[in-house]
Amino acid sequence: MQAEGRTALTVRTWRTLFSVAWFVWILDLATKIWAVSTLSERSNVKVLGSFFQLTLIRNPGAAFSFATGATIFLTLFSIIVLLTIFYFSPRITSKGWAVVLGLVTGGILGNLIDRIFREPGVLRGHVIDWMQLPNWPIFNIADSAIVIAALISMVLSARNIPPITKVGS
């Protein structure tokens, strides 16, 4: 009986993880296509005054200008994180953690695709960022998904909900 329950949980959590990841990735891709076709480089379109603006940039690094020009490192790191998520995903203990890992997976895929395929070239691509808040780096949907995942993971951890089962459980 426990094996059947575990199988059902695994199927549900995998479905949740991959559905969330797919949704984030598609939304990120669609909004980046829209931003590139609609916004001009470095122009500010005020949506909510100076609080929320649309500003298109092509980011060669990560948030806060970290690792600018280290696209290959960021690409490899992203691939390692994705492989780690896939390795541990069969042992996810709850739908909440499946959502967290789905958000992270979708966010990583969104920025990884940019790094691999966008200009200036393969494995040197710049990430499309286009949303701006005051005193914060310009970001995109993928970045937002990763931040939301971090916040949800803090709540789950505070509630003592473990992310994965131990080997042999």
Predicted regions and their residues:
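Alpha-helical transmembrane bundles and membrane-interface segments of multipass inner-membrane proteins
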Residues: 1-169
